[in-house]
Amino acid sequence: MSQNNDSLTRFMLDGANVRGALVKLTRTWQTISSRIEYPSAVADYLGQSVAASALFISSIKIDGRLSIQMRGTGAIKTLFAECTTDGTLRGLSIFEPPIPAHIPLSDFGADSIMAITIERNTAPELEPQRYQGLVGFQAQDLASAFEQYFEQSEQLPTRIVLFSNAEQAVGLLIQQMPEQDRPADDWSRIQMLFDTVRAEELFSLDANELLYRLFHEESVRVLDSLALSFACSCSRERVETALISLGLDEMQQTLLENENITVHCDFCGQAYQFSQEQGLSLFWPKSSVPVSPSMH
């Protein structure tokens, strides 16, 4: 039986005016998590974040990408997950050992910041259009924090469940759509059904089978399914922009100490190498690059 691995399934509960999304990641998650040897607690947060980014892209009506980014002062310094409307994902975490077996959300640090950013694709010569909202750390876990975000920022009652292990990252989301004259107990009834889902079901069941098992009495209707895969948006042009931002003085100093500069992408491992001439040509036209005698 196909288990809809590496897919995002959107659905409607027509009987209650509730929309939802189900994400299952296997190969994609294994590719992301294999780049760095993550402690289990860090991998768990990263897997949940990657799954959440796919869930959230399900309701985006623009051509672009959605990212979840956290900067903390605790053991986990950075958490980043991104999904595009084309179905490509990437993710990364930076942490500081030793890492405990369990990290409560409250231990991310008092000055921690987590943001959800939506970026609309634009022409290369135009500045990207971004929309950003902040996620609080007052919840018990990541899924609850995202639920509070949608409740407060989007005014959409939302339920989310997220799980990850070494093999898979999965998630389920339901949202009550705005509509007047709906029975007040519709949403309560759907939540009761939602609360029965177990991690083992999300890991093992086919998407259609899981949705039928949970919501067959609520006229569940699958809208579509999007294939998901790992892909990185790094490029030589982006690396050049980052090097230029360092400034000419730092570039010259680096090139005095090294024959060339090699930049590795932490997401995919791609290496970008720049010779002395290539590094300096980022600041001057190639024909006028001044070469120091010490750089011969």
Task: Outline where the language-model segments fall.
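Cys/His-clustered metal-coordination modules, chiefly Zn-binding fingers
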Residues: 195-296
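Interaction interfaces in information-processing and related assembly proteins
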Residues: 2-224, 292-296
